[in-house]
C-alpha cells in the first residue's frame, strides 16, 4: 500500500501582535492541505516594508505561531527579502497569500516557475472583517487609549 503524499501549504507574514484576523487566515490556509508551514518575516524585512520595527521580535513571533495547533512548522525568513531559496527547500504544494498581502499573483507565479518551484498560489479572502483585525489598527488603538 502506497502512502498518500501530504499536501504542504506554505504561507508567510509578519504576524506581529497576533489577532483574530491572523487566526482565521491560518485556519483557512491549513484547510488547503495537511501541513502548514509559516515563514515569519525577519525583523529587518519588517522595518524595510512597514517603516517600523516589529513590536515582537522574529523569535517571539515564531514561538507564538509554533504554539498554534494549526501550524505545523515555523521558519524565520531571510533579512530584507522574500527568499525563494527557503520556499524551494520547503517544497510546498500550495502557497497561501493573505488577503492584505500586496503580491502580484501573476508575477509571483512567474518567479516561482523560473525558480522551478511547482506550487499553486492561492489568495485567501477575508474571512473576518474588523477594524481590530489589523495590527496597525491595534497599535493605533493602544496609543489612543494609553498614551493620550
Curated annotation (Swiss-Prot):
Transmembrane segments: none annotated. Keywords: ATP-binding, FAD, Flavoprotein, FMN, Nucleotide-binding, Nucleotidyltransferase, Transferase. HAMAP family: FAD_synth_arch. It catalyses: FMN + ATP + H(+) = FAD + diphosphate. One of its GO terms (molecular function) is FMN adenylyltransferase activity. Catalyzes the transfer of the AMP portion of ATP to flavin mononucleotide (FMN) to produce flavin adenine dinucleotide (FAD) coenzyme. GO terms for biological process: FAD biosynthetic process; FMN metabolic process. Coiled coil: none annotated. Pathway: Cofactor biosynthesis; FAD biosynthesis; FAD from FMN: step 1/1. Its EC number is 2.7.7.2. Pfam families: CTP_transf_like. Its cofactor is a divalent metal cation. Homodimer. It comes from Thermococcus sibiricus (strain DSM 12597 / MM 739). This is FAD synthase. Gene3D superfamilies: HUPs. The gene is ribL. Belongs to the archaeal FAD synthase family. ATP binds at residues 14-15, 19-22, 100.
Amino acid at each position: 500500500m502506497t502512502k498518500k503524499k501530504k499536501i504542504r501549504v506554505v504561507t508567510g507574514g509578519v504576524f506581529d501582535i497576533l489577532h483574530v484576523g491572523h487566526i482565521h487566515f491560518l485556519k483557512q490556509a491549513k484547510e488547503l492541505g495537511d501541513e502548514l508551514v509559516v515563514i515569519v518575516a525577519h525583523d529587518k524585512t519588517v522595518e524595510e516594508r512597514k517603516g517600523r520595527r516589529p513590536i515582537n521580535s522574529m523569535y517571539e513571533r515564531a514561538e507564538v505561531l509554533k504554539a498554534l495547533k494549526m501550524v505545523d512548522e515555523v521558519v524565520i525568513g531571510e533579512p530584507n527579502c522574500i527568499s525563494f531559496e527557503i520556499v524551494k527547500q520547503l517544497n510546498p504544494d500550495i502557497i497561501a497569500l493573505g488577503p492584505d498581502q500586496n503580491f502580484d499573483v501573476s508575477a509571483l507565479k512567474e518567479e516561482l516557475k523560473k525558480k522551478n518551484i511547482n506550487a499553486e498560489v492561492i489568495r485567501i479572502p477575508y474571512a473576518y472583517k474588523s477594524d481590530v483585525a489589523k495590527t496597525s489598527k491595534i497599535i493605533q488603538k493602544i496609543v489612543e487609549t494609553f498614551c493620550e
